[in-house]
Amino acid sequence: MRPIHVAHLDKARPVLVLTRELVLPHQQQVTVAPITTTVRGLSTEVLVGPANGIGHESVVSCDNIVTIDKNALGERIGYLFPAQEPLLTAAIHAAFDLDN
């Protein structure tokens, strides 16, 4: 399962870690997708909520994927479930206009 952490960026906000867990110990930076309560209904969003460890219904915003310093990651607060992985894949494909 992909972890959801609090990241200390412009302010503390939840993020979904996209970098593979296998390489995390060897990296100084990690790629994350921010999680926001602003739901636009876009194909680049993945719905998450309390079951994922997020306090409110929110979305993973794949239009705003960024790479941050690993030290900016705070505590793990939840996970994206395996059943949500196909939705994440589709959202990333849409965000980067990739063919399936």
Regions found by a protein language model. Give the residues of each.
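Conserved functional hotspots at enzyme active or ligand-binding sites that engage polyanionic ligands
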Residues: 1-100
